[in-house]
Amino acid sequence: RMDPRLFNVSTTAAPTKEELGFHYLWRFYKTLPKNGHITIYDRSWYGRVMVEKIEHLTPDYRTNQAYEEINGFEKSLIHDGLFVIKYLIIINEEEQLKRFKQREEDPMKVYKITDEDWRNREKFSAYDDRMNEMVNRTSTEYAPWILLSGQDKKAARIKVLEHFIQH
């Protein structure tokens, strides 16, 4: 059994003014789980090599350096006794469009879709390229990516839960 009081979900938005004054990984140290607890990241330090690369927010040499920093960060977490499990749920462009339209049409979900989502959708190919590079450069023996098809949202969620429970 898992006690929900031991779970925390950490969402990652754009860095604050304070966070910008530090190394980009600094803000994640504050969200690491306590001993016996679990933190689930909705986005994470991978924004450095995805969003920041695509939006040209970080110079290319720093983005490339980030891959080594991320691998080192995850290795240090594991050496400190944390488990790092990385899931990447992948959908194709058609499925994304279908979900966007459903959100716009459903009054209970319309808040989930923004102009920024549509703007980013125009960069689907760039995100796909960055995603492939990210997986290739950060799937390590100690912290491999678990890649799952997200075409069927419910099935993907079940697969994540099944895998998580086994580990």
What kind of feature is each model-predicted range?
Residues 1-3:
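A conserved segment at the C-terminal end of the G1
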Residues 7-67:
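Conserved nucleotide-sensing/catalytic segment adjacent to the nucleotide-binding pocket
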Residues 11, 39-42, 84-88, 147:
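A structural signal for short, well-ordered beta-strand segments and their strand-loop junctions
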Residues 15-18, 44-47, 90-97, 117, ...:
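Conserved nucleotide-binding/hydrolysis micro-motifs of P-loop NTPases
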Residues 33-35, 80-82, 141-142:
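Short loop/turn elements that form and flank the Walker-type P-loop nucleotide-binding site
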Residues 51-69, 77-129:
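A glycine- and Lys/Arg-enriched "phosphate-lid" helix/loop adjacent to the NTP-binding pocket
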Residues 73:
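Phosphate-binding/switch loop-helix module in NTP-utilizing enzymes
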Residues 129-167:
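NTP-dependent small-molecule kinase module
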